[in-house]
Amino acid sequence: MDRLNQLSGQLKPNAKQSILQKNPDDVVIVAAYRTAIGKGFKGSFRNVHSEFILTEFLKEFIKKTNIDPSLIEDVAIGNVLNQAAGATEHRGACLAAGIPYTAAFIAVNRFCSSGLMAISDIANKIKTGEIECGLAGGAESMSTNYRDPRVAPRIDPHLADDAQMEKCLIPMGITNENVANQFNISRERQDEFAAKSYNKAAKAVASGAFKSEILPIRSIIRNSDGTEKEIIVDTDEGPREGVTAESLGKLRPAFDGTTTAGNASQVSDGAAAVLLMKRSLAEAKGYPIIGKYVLCSTAGVPPEIMGVGPAFAIPEVLKRTGLTVDDIDVFEINEAFAAQCLYSAEQVNVPEEKLNINGGAIALGHPLGETGARQYATIIPLLKPGQIGLTSMCIGSGMGSASILVRE
């Protein structure tokens, strides 16, 4: 009997083998694309709103994937800065792009993880049998909403002096200063990390590495004389060549500390989406399967050091999947700020060569609600079939999220 138990244990697949197995009820990724990311306030999307970006993008997404829109049963779009997370205008964008009204819609706002939460929402609906096909993504126009006073939270005066409430209202840049101070992350290290992000992204743009994940879309810019001009946006506007730690070191801190415009993520505009299906449906309809969604986990952390979120969310998703850091082939950890990304990656022992291979949000930009979906569009081309990827980000008010996917 002991011998039989030993043999049974040997035949049982380990966690990695189990995740790589293909089953009819898997949640698979049929497509993942994004727009080029526009610079906030002065880039190619500066004069259009998120619903315009999303409409134009979804039109191209449907055309590129040749998906039958009537198969889409639900759409989840992440957004942070629009009122009600874009619930009305982004539903309208879906309809304007050609998705039928029979597809339901949900607006998702969990700050910087909103795009990933949209993916998780659709994936979980497929897992539970609510739907068999859904579209998840994110869209953000920081150019039109970032400085809108209506975006600021309004707190009941009876709670205005509550210590815990106050922690949730700390500006993101100050929370990064807290991380840098508490964990001794110097300005020099932050600038070195940021320079590497710029250099990797600039190299990726120059080599055309992003072309497979970007769908060129139409935008409209307003000239100084009031006339409008139609343009095509197909290249990320944040990356630039020749950035060094020394050049970044000359920038003035945004606060009383080490955070600067050079070692923090850029204010940006853009959209991204992931088409998810039940494997059996994708196979029956003949759609290509480029990946498999595995799991997403979210962890809470102290709001005043919210940037450490990935250091807690990554171990959580690894524990729940039975994987180890060594099982992961590529990591995409959002670079909200250099200090928090550095800390999180080091706490989890992420090998530098596996982290943000083509740069991150410091160089590319961070359209808040779009980032989680953008990471999927970016990481999938970096993975070889059978490899495993992990995406993660910190979340304002004290959280972190992380997800696991497999390339097929």
Swiss-Prot record:
List of catalytic residues: 112 (acyl-thioester intermediate), 366 (proton acceptor), 394 (proton acceptor)
Pathway: Lipid metabolism; fatty acid metabolism
Keyword Hydrolase in annotation: no
EC number: 2.3.1.16
Pfam families according to UniProt: Thiolase_C, Thiolase_N
PROSITE patterns named among the record's database cross-references: THIOLASE_1, THIOLASE_2, THIOLASE_3
Subcellular location: Peroxisome
A molecular function (GO) term: acetyl-CoA C-acyltransferase activity
Family, per entry: Belongs to the thiolase-like superfamily. Thiolase family.
Protein's UniProt name: 3-ketoacyl-CoA thiolase B, peroxisomal
Native source species: Candida tropicalis
